Amino acid sequence: MKSVDLKILDARMREYLPAYATPGSAGLDLRACTEASLVIEPGQTVLVPTGLAIHIGDPRYAAMILPRSGLGHKHGIVLGNLVGLIDSDYQGQLMVSTWNRGTQPFTLDPMERLAQLVIVPVQQVAFNVVEDFDASERGAGGFGSTGRA
């Protein structure tokens, strides 16, 4: 398996290096690399630095920033862009677009776990204009066509 080199921008992160929690974990926790607590008001979206920069450097891979389920379910804290896609040639700091969709202000403390980083394989495609498609059982059916609508 290819290893991705994570570069650290903030020296405080030495004590908070991302790690897989279990052998079956897919995601690495990203933390709020802030100097002070940050209050996110209901409906507000803020960019939160993670202190981490990555350069995957291999177009067969990308990274995805995903929300932590507990923050979304219990506090309404989700990603402002729903999913963050990090291309293999990006080299900057990872920032988390953080949206409070809840009804109460949320205080995000320094180094609090905020999101998850997952490395995924990528298959780039080539488009080919055709006259029609080969027939399939499903056809053009969508939006509930294979089950309960």
UniProtKB/Swiss-Prot annotation:
Keywords associated with the record: Hydrolase, Magnesium, Metal-binding, Nucleotide metabolism
Indicate the enzyme's highest-level EC class: hydrolase
Cysteines engaged in disulfide bonds, as pairs:
none
Q: In which pathway does it act?
A: Pyrimidine metabolism; dUMP biosynthesis; dUMP from dCTP (dUTP route): step 2/2
Kindly indicate whether the keyword Protease belongs to this entry: no
Q: Which residues does the record give as substrate binding sites?
A: 68-70, 81, 85-87, 95
This entry's Gene Ontology molecular function terms read: dUTP diphosphatase activity; magnesium ion binding
Tell me where on the tree of life, at the top rank, the source sits. Bacteria
Reactions listed under catalytic activity: dUTP + H2O = dUMP + diphosphate + H(+)
Q: Which EC number(s) does the record attach to this protein? A: 3.6.1.23
The cofactor required is:
Mg(2+)
Q: Which InterPro entries match?
A: dUTPase, dUTPase-like, dUTPase-like_sf, dUTPase_trimeric
Q: State the Gene Ontology BP annotations.
A: dUMP biosynthetic process; dUTP catabolic process
Q: Which family does it belong to?
A: Belongs to the dUTPase family.
NCBIfam families on file:
dut (TIGR00576), PRK00601.1 (NF001862)
What role does this protein play? This enzyme is involved in nucleotide metabolism: it produces dUMP, the immediate precursor of thymidine nucleotides and it decreases the intracellular concentration of dUTP so that uracil cannot be incorporated into DNA.
Protein's name in the database = Deoxyuridine 5'-triphosphate nucleotidohydrolase
What gene is it encoded by? dut
